[in-house]
């Protein structure tokens, strides 16, 4: 749910994703927990996470068939019915959305080949949503969105979680976070409260939690409370709960790339949030004067190999 660019501790620059509890969320979600450890498939959680691609066509096709059988058995569709999927776009004037739409349609169409859904998927688009994409999804006017969503709060993942758990912000109207219960282990004790109550707790509100033995106590872990480690653990548990709803499905990713010249050195080769790697021109240093650079290029036969 959260990328490496979400910072859990602005004072230290530590990203949310770098913490062990956040790593475990991913390992658990992708079903790799039993495969991590000495002598197992993955030595560390980092190794396991590195292996995650989210792509397993054979398993996906099994699930397509299972979903089809369930839908027919429950009377949600009849054999031979078409499944209509409307993808919402803010507009159709940019390549990102038009090409993205084509990409998703092709991927799903090809993925169901050989399954009971082959030839039964029909895609349409609504490219008139503009900034109203969230309301359109909540009102079931569209079935899928991509390339849109919440931004901001990169330095406050605790506040950002409200976008996925609150009635005012979340896209999924079917998930009642005030009644969905979530158990979080804190200091060796398992405590249970609703998803929404846990969210309130990390925002500084006092809530009542129930321990495994049935006893109740109060809990709060806001910005000013002296239990930031527990606050982080609750946030991780909330991320896991959101992922388990399977409403946020990783479908696409985008990135940018730049070629670093042999003529310069960056201030650091490590990414720094808000700065990047080179931190603007004032942090660049040059390895050659213009004359030295000309000589260097000539010494390489006039062509530099950046492979």
Spell out what each predicted region is.
Residues 7-58, 73-82, 136, 162-218, ...:
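Short, solvent-exposed loop/beta-turn-alpha elements that line the ligand-binding surface or hinge
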Residues 139, 151, 166-170, 204, ...:
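Short, well-ordered loop/turn and helix-capping segments at boundaries between secondary-structure elements
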Residues 1, 63-92, 202, 206-261:
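Bilobed periplasmic-binding protein-like "clamshell/Venus-flytrap" ligand-binding domains
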Residues 29-30, 34-152, 228-231, 256:
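Ligand/substrate-recognition segments at binding pockets and active sites
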Residues 1-4, 61, 98-104, 155-160, ...:
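Short, solvent-exposed loop/turn and secondary-structure capping segments
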Residues 61, 105, 134, 138, ...:
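Generic hydrophobic alpha-helical scaffold/packing signal
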Residues 53, 97, 191, 224, ...:
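Aromatic-acidic/polar surface patches that form glycan- and anion
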Residues 6, 10-11, 15, 109, ...:
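Hydrophobic/aromatic-lined pockets within catalytic cores
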């Amino acid at each position: 749910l959260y990328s490496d660019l979400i910072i859990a501790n602005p004072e230290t620059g530590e990203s949310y994703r770098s913490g062990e509890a956040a790593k475990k969320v991913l390992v658990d979600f992708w079903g790799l927990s039993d495969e991590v450890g000495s002598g197992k498939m993955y030595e560390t959680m980092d190794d396991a996470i590195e292996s995650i691609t989210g792509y397993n066509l054979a398993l996906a096709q099994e699930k397509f068939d299972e979903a089809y059988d369930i839908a027919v058995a429950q009377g949600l569709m009849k054999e031979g019915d078409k499944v209509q999927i409307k993808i919402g776009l803010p507009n159709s004037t940019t390549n990102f959305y038009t090409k993205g739409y084509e990409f998703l349609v092709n991927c799903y169409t090809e993925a169901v080949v050989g399954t009971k859904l082959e030839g039964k998927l029909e895609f349409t688009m609504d490219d008139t949503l503009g900034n109203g994409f969230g309301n359109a999804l909540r009102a079931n006017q569209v079935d899928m969105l991509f390339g849109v969503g919440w931004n901001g709060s990169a330095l406050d993942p605790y506040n950002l979680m409200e976008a996925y758990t609150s009635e005012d912000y979340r896209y999924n109207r079917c998930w009642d976070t005030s009644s969905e219960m979530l158990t979080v282990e804190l200091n060796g004790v398992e405590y249970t409260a609703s998803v929404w109550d846990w969210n309130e707790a990390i925002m500084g509100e006092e809530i009542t939690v129930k321990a495994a033995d049935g006893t109740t106590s109060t809990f709060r872990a806001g910005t000013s409370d002296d239990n930031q480690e527990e606050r982080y653990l609750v946030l991780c548990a909330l991320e896991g709960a959101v992922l388990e709803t399977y409403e946020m499905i990783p479908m696409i990713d985008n990135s940018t790339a730049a070629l670093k010249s042999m003529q310069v050195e960056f201030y650091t080769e490590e990414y720094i949030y808000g700065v990047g790697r080179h931190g603007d021109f004032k942090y660049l240093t040059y390895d050659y004067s213009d004359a030295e650079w000309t000589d260097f290029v000539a010494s390489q036969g006039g062509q530099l190999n950046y492979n």
